[in-house]
Structures are given as structure tokens and as C-alpha cells.
From Swiss-Prot:
In early embryos, expressed at a low level in most tissues with expression becoming abundant in the liver by 96 hours post-fertilization (hpf). The expression pattern in adults exhibits sexual dimorphism; in adult males expression is limited exclusively to the liver whereas in adult females expression is observed in the liver and other tissues including the gut, kidney, ovary and muscle. It comes from Danio rerio. Residues 1-17 form the signal peptide. IGF-binding proteins prolong the half-life of the IGFs and have been shown to either inhibit or stimulate the growth promoting effects of the IGFs on cell culture. They alter the interaction of IGFs with their cell surface receptors. The gene is igfbp2b. Residues 166-248 form the Thyroglobulin type-1 domain. InterPro entries: Growth_fac_rcpt_cys_sf, IGFBP-2, IGFBP-like, IGFBP_1-6_chordata, Insulin_GF-bd_Cys-rich_CS, Thyroglobulin_1, Thyroglobulin_1_sf. This is Insulin-like growth factor-binding protein 2-B.
Length: 265
């Protein structure tokens, strides 16, 4: 998960705008273990606090919390008509679009810090989450809660109207958002140990779990990924947690992806 996008979840109308986060140093040893790029592309650092160089996503390509960064001058935005933009970003259904200028022009040093480029073995500089992330956060959280309030209002207005039940994955996501809103911050420092412990469920368009689930990158290493049952979110026994692609497509059509039986529930 991208730490920058995670920071965007914590900004509410600028009230937490002064919280500062620092990623661990990208040592030469960690960078030496990175896989070599075989194609020519714009190079950016891995999402979150990863240290390895990866190819940036280009304009119009899908992007989200778990994907690599967009290229220079681009940001990952949810669609304008999305009812739940935050969930769209978590599902990897955003798009890399031209960055919306919502803040004064940054200095060269601030721009380099914000771009996420690989900076040798130096520690990534301390930075404040930009206002463009605050913009995404405000839209996402406001629409998320407005949608919930609308469903509650419609149910009260007409008791006979069936209320769509949230899936297990959506309920789990709501709990994570609630935990974030209740987090306490002290001395203008973000409790990174708490943030890294957060487990964002990766839900698909229908509200079920995406087959591939991942932890956010920490300590210069990409987060572990694994395959789950789309109905329960439980890790498939034969699927190991790996720092890369767990190849979840191998389970398509297999019994591992079947809904649980009444006895299993």
C-alpha cells in the first residue's frame, strides 16, 4: 500500500496537515536485492516505503492503493462520478491523470521529495502530505459517509424498502476507516507502528474480496501478498505469502474459490 495514499486517509480538512512521516533508509544492501528492470521506462520507487525501482504507470492506466505510482505530473484519482472513491482506489480502479494544482508551486527540493523517485542510499526526506492527497481524502471520506447516511435515510423514510446488506469485505473496510478516524496523534508525529498494522481489505466491484491481498511496504521491503477465497477473505491454504506476485489466477475454476457451505459457515 502506498504510504502517501495512506496519509491521505488521515487528512481531514487540514486538521492533521502537520503530521510528518519518515520512511526507513534505503540501504545499499536492500537496493542490491532489488530485481533488475528489463524495459525502458520512467523509474519511480515502489509504493509505500519500498526501496526498489519500478516502472511508473502512464496516463490513463489503472492505479490505486496497491499499485505502482503514476508518472511525472500525474496522480491517481478516482472517477468523478464514483459514489465511493476511496473504495475505488483500494480496488485499484483509479486512473492516472494530470495532477490537479491545489497548492502553491513547490520548490525543487519539495518536488523531488513528493515525486517518490529513488534517491540512492539516502533516506527519503521528511515530507508533509500534499494538498492534492487532502483533496482526495476529503472527497473519499465525505462521499463514503454521505452514501451511508443516504442509505440510512432511505431506510427510515420507507421501512419497506429493502436495505442492501454490506458484504463481509465492505464491513471490514468500514471498521478500518473507523479505526483511522479514532487514532490519536501526539507531538505532530504519526504513529507509524499503528499505521503499518492496519490491514486494508482489497474489495472488488461487487464487494467481495479480490483474490490478491497485500500488506503495505515497510522497512524498505515490498509488502507480502497472498491469495484468498473471495467470499470469506480467508487465505487459501496452498497459497504462500510472498513479496511479489502470488499468481492467484492459478486458482480460477478451482474449489478454493467456491462459496462456503452451510457447515463451513
Amino acid at each position: 500500500m502506498s504510504l502517501a495514499l495512506l496519509c491521505s486517509l488521515l487528512l481531514v480538512h487540514g486538521s492533521l496537515g502537520e503530521i510528518v512521516f519518515r520512511c526507513p533508509s534505503c540501504t545499499a544492501e536492500r537496493q542490491a536485492a532489488c530485481p533488475k528492470l528489463t524495459t525502458s521506462c520512467e523509474i519511480v520507487r515502489e509504493p509505500g516505503c519500498g526501496c526498489c525501482p519500478v516502472c511508473a504507470r502512464q496516463k490513463g492506466e489503472l492505479c490505486g492503493v496497491y499499485t505502482t505510482r503514476c508518472g511525472s505530473g500525474l496522480r491517481c484519482y478516482p472517477s468523478a462520478n464514483s459514489e465511493l472513491p476511496l473504495e475505488q482506489l483500494i480496488q485499484g480502479l483509479g486512473r492516472c491523470e494530470n495532477k490537479v494544482d491545489l497548492e502553491p508551486t513547490m520548490t525543487n527540493q519539495e518536488s523531488a521529495a513528493h515525486s517518490g523517485e529513488v534517491n540512492g542510499t539516502r533516506s527519503p526526506p521528511m515530507k508533509k502530505p500534499g494538498k492534492d492527497y487532502q483533496y482526495i481524502k476529503e472527497i473519499a471520506v465525505n462521499k463514503h459517509h454521505n452514501n451511508k447516511r443516504t442509505r440510512m435515510y432511505n431506510t427510515q423514510d420507507d421501512p419497506k424498502t429493502p436495505h442492501p446488506k454490506q458484504s463481509q469485505c465492505q464491513q471490514e473496510l468500514d471498521k478500518v476507516l473507523e479505526n483511522i478516524s479514532r487514532m490519536a496523534f501526539h507531538d505532530n508525529k504519526g504513529p507509524l507502528e499503528n499505521l503499518y498494522d492496519l490491514k486494508f481489505p482489497n474489495c472488488d466491484k461487487t464487494g467481495q474480496y479480490n483474490l490478491k491481498q497485500c500488506h503495505m511496504s515497510t522497512h524498505g521491503q515490498r509488502g507480502e501478498c497472498w491469495c484468498v477465497n473471495p467470499y470469506t477473505g480467508v487465505q487459501i491454504p496452498s497459497s504462500d505469502k510472498v513479496r511479489g506476485d502470488p499468481n492467484c489466477s492459478q486458482y480460477y475454476g478451482g474449489p478454493e474459490l467456491e462459496p462456503p457451505t452451510a457447515q463451513q459457515k
